[in-house]
């Protein structure tokens, strides 16, 4: 009876360990997929400062989030991920297509130009593609997305965005790293 209990305990430990290893391997696979997806998206020819893409990977399924300026970009991103990232089972999109608007386009261009041409922000202008600060405009309302190097740069980008005529509000989601 004692041998049976010991054997049962060892079996339970082994099964728990194997189950944990399987979950860890799946997690690792998703992490590898996420790194590859990030690479594909960052280098995509259609990814501009006027779009913002986030994603999650769960059991090999990639789900895209964010905003883009044109609907064709979503299909292009999905095709690139499926073509260049092994082990992706499916790509889903929950992305928002920003409304077409001449006024928003004008605001978008001026804000990005002013941010990337400000002497204090030049290090972001010469950064590798894609640029680290993304300017999302919807009905005159700006959302800044991306990453900057300091709290001061975050506030400066917001101040530059607020100074543009036609801007109704600015939401600053820039992360400081």
Q: Whereabouts are the PLM-identified features?
A:
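N-terminal targeting leaders
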Residues: 2-8, 16-177
């Amino acid at each position: 009876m004692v041998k049976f209990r010991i054997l049962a305990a060892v079996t339970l430990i082994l099964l728990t360990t194997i189950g944990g290893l399987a979950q860890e391997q799946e997690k690792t696979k998703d992490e590898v997929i996420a790194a590859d997806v990030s690479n594909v998206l960052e280098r995509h020819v259609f990814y501009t400062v006027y779009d913002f893409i986030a994603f999650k990977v769960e059991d090999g399924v990639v789900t895209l989030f964010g905003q883009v300026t044109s609907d064709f970009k979503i299909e292009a991103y999905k095709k690139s991920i499926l073509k260049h990232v092994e082990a992706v089972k499916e790509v889903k999109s929950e992305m928002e297509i920003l409304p077409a608007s001449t006024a928003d386009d004008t605001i978008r261009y001026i804000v990005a130009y002013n941010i990337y041409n400000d002497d204090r922000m030049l290090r972001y202008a010469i950064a590798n593609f894609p640029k680290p600060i993304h300017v999302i405009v919807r009905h005159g309302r700006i959302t800044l997305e991306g990453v900057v190097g300091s709290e001061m740069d975050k506030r400066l980008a917001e101040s530059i965005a607020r100074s543009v005529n036609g801007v109704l509000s600015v939401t600053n989601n820039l992360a400081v790293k």
